[in-house]
Amino acid sequence: ELFDWQSIPAVKALAGSPRITPPFKPHLEDKLWLALLWSPALKKIWEQTLRGSHLKRLRELVPFGWVLDPTPLPPHAALPKINVHSWDEVADFSQKERQLVLKISGFHETAWGSRGVFIGHDMPGPEWSERLHSALDLSSEQPWIVQEFREGRRIEHPVFRDDGSVEMMQG
């Protein structure tokens, strides 16, 4: 992991020393958790593991998501919230329906720095379809997720300076 290690002075100084695997904070680096939060099969586990107010807040902050899985759904089933029977239908969504984000997950050279992130409505339909089908084909080797798209926004937040002072900034 740490594909950008050369830009981190402390890690660069250790180059060739210890071998570190998995990454330093795997629980923060794997996007799969973003989709698993919404898995109906895990609902009770999340409710038992997390305080109610914390789970509620996480669900407010984390856009709804799905683990990309090529396994066919039973005839009577549908993907939650988008109510389609297959990823092929999602691949054929119109630009308006493609308010979705496709993301590679796990520990891969394209899983950081937005290298493996594709915004559905920002790309032509054929390219969206190709990316989605490619991710489905690769899903047995590398996990992928799809999330609802949400517009970013600027907020005011504290920045803690080395001298102990706190400055409010927009970001």
Regions found by a protein language model. Name each.
Residues E1-G171:
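Domain-scale recognition of functional cores that engage charged ligands
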